[in-house]
């Protein structure tokens, strides 16, 4: 279809919209998508085979996934968020689709209700304010037709949209969402450390303080992940903590911790004998800040949704997080210093995702594919598990196989009459060891995040299966406390 015919058809769509505007205002988002948004993109060269559509009922309004993902081949090139006609495109909705695109490493995002349409190059610094293109009314689809064509299939196939963004200096890459999360986690770590030192001066050594801080942050991330995947406990969210007065914030947080321990029965929330995180009190103002930073970045540019952030990305964030060592200044303030040299001295290195994928595909993947052994009998050990990237990928392979295979029937039902493949995989298949105690705790967290299901107890075996020590040496005269027994 040539440009003049496209313009003619778009004009017909605009005329219909204007004529039936009051009726369109009554329509649901799903109806607007079918009657207006999809026809517009069809005129721009896209077909039904080029996009995935996810209904509000499927995804849950609060999870906030984009309405459409548009593909060139098997690669997503932009996301689209649709709102009802007559409802202004608000900043929060725009921020949401930008954050979603960033979390999925996609360069473009679109927000529209047909009355307005905004295109964002999400790699640009301040993308929310510096929009790639804006159409303030349907008439501008024609008056700015060349700009509208940047959303055409041909433009993405030929790389024209990306080239235009580059020529305008929009690809001076902004801080990625995982990098921002890392910075916010480190800021949170410093806030808690300074508050502990202020309230309990000299009571804790640096390593003891770090263990307390990590346990608290791990719990907060677990809770946020449960919220964003829709399996959180009713009326127990960090958002509620944010809304409370400072003098009640920490009490509410402790209540949430207790309820999560009661329901999930995981060591993550249990009162630990060797960790004082449940014995100390943290300033309410600090608690409210911690909660806020796990919903939205400190600079206000990102919305964090832990359902969007893949486990391997979270693992990478934690690997870098562990590379920073907590230190204390003479004034008593906490600061973070680069600890990469220390980690390398201990032989602690991060394994890139593509290598993890290759190893798992050619080991676990081959066993599962060729059915050389029953899945329930496979034992997988990572003797230097780090943050658990290999074990997480192995978990995914086993789970995907069991979910669709006959062998799943061989997994037993638990004591409550409930059946969980995820729990059984952690009980039967997954093992890990690492020299770094912090890495061990993060591996446990990442696996628990994988296994968590609404109101299902988590396996206690994870504390036995994921261990701290030197997997090569069992002689304590050589390895000391790190000797693996």
Stretches with model-predicted labels:
Residues 70-72, 83-86, 313, 319-322, ...:
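Short, flexible loop/turn elements at secondary-structure junctions
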């Amino acid at each position: 279809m040539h440009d003049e015919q496209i313009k003619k058809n778009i004009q017909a769509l605009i005329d219909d919209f204007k004529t039936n505007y009051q009726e369109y205002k009554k329509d649901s988002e799903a109806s607007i998508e079918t009657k207006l948004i999809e026809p517009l993109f069809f005129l721009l060269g896209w077909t039904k085979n080029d996009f995935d559509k996810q209904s509000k009922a499927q995804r849950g309004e609060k999870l906030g996934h984009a309405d459409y993902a548009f593909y060139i081949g098997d690669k997503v090139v932009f996301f689209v968020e649709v709102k009802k006609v007559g409802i202004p495109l608000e900043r929060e909705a725009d921020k949401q689709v930008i954050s979603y695109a960033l979390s999925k490493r996609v360069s473009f995002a679109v927000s529209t209700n047909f009355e307005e349409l905004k295109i964002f190059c999400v790699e640009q610094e301040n993308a929310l304010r510096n929009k790639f293109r804006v159409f303030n009314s349907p008439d501008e689809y024609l008056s700015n037709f060349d700009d509208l064509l940047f959303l055409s299939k041909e433009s993405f196939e030929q790389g024209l949209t990306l080239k235009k963004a580059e020529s305008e200096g929009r690809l001076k890459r902004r801080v990625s969402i995982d990098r921002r999360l890392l910075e916010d986690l480190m800021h949170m770590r410093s806030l808690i450390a300074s508050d502990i030192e202020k309230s309990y001066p000299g009571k804790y050594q640096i390593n003891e303080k770090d263990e307390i801080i990590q346990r608290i942050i791990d719990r907060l991330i677990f809770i946020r992940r449960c919220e964003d995947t829709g399996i959180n406990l009713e009326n127990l969210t960090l958002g509620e903590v944010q809304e409370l007065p400072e003098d009640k914030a920490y009490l509410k947080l402790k209540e949430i911790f207790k309820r999560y321990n009661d329901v999930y029965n995981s060591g993550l929330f249990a009162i630990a004998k060797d960790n004082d995180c449940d014995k100390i009190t943290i300033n309410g103002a600090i608690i409210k800040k911690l909660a806020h930073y796990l919903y939205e970045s400190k600079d206000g540019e990102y919305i964090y949704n832990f359902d969007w952030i893949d486990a391997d990305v979270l693992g990478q964030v934690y690997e870098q997080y562990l590379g920073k060592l907590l230190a204390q200044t003479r004034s008593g303030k906490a600061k973070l210093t680069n600890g990469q040299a220390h980690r390398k001295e201990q032989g602690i290195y991060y394994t890139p995702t593509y290598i993890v994928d290759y190893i798992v595909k050619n080991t676990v993947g081959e066993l599962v594919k060729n059915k050389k052994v029953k899945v329930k009998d496979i034992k997988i050990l990572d003797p230097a598990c780090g943050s658990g990237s290999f074990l997480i990928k192995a978990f995914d392979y086993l789970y995907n196989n069991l979910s669709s295979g006959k062998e799943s029937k061989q997994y037993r039902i638990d004591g409550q009459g409930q059946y969980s493949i995820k729990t059984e995989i952690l009980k039967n298949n997954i093992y890990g060891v690492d020299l770094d105690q912090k890495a061990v705790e993060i591996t446990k967290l990442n696996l628990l995040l994988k296994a968590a299901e609404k109101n299902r107890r988590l396996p206690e075996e994870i504390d036995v299966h994921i261990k701290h020590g030197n997997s090569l040496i069992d002689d304590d005269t050589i390895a000391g406390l790190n000797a693996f027994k």
